[in-house]
């Protein structure tokens, strides 16, 4: 997370200069790319900038992303969803309640996300979490090949719609790698990186 003072300065800059492209950059950096950010406040800033920059397409995109993040922010309950995994079986939010769940995005072109997948698979095999992967590749066959190559055991979803998939929007997942952690039906963490996952694995092995 970003130091609170930096976030405070960024907010003040946006309020003082809603017409500036720098304000758009700061909002993206300190709210969309910052886990645990105040998405409600970010939306207020985006609305302020939109009044001064009505034709800015980036702001429209930020607003859309923030609405999704707000609905699936830390402390909120896991939004309802239904999807099919790559074996054609239904994956429903209602079936995931009361467990520790990690839902993670990945892609064939993102080494970091593949590294995260392998760490998540270890957690899954040790029974520490139920993991669901969402592949954002356009080629479902390529995604299946990678799962088989890396011997990934947990369920994966790949609808071929890349970052425009419905499930990504429902869960507020907008980058690769990205993830949410759900405990007892509530979102408790976002964007846990591979090194943190490995540390947790090391702690389990002690």
Q: What name fits each language-model region?
A:
Residues 1-54:
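Preference for long, solvent-exposed alpha-helical segments and helix-linker "stalks"
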Residues 19-20, 97-99, 173-176:
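Active-site acidic short loop of glycosyltransferases
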Residues 60-93, 203:
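N-terminal "domain-start" segment that seeds a small globular fold
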Residues 97-119:
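Conserved redox-active cysteine motifs that mediate thiol-disulfide chemistry
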Residues 102-103, 131, 179:
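Hydrophobic beta-strand anchors of alpha/beta hydrolase catalytic cores
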Residues 112-150, 162-168:
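Structural microenvironment flanking redox-active thiols in thiol-disulfide oxidoreductases
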Residues 152, 159-205:
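Thiol/disulfide oxidoreductase modules built on the thioredoxin-like
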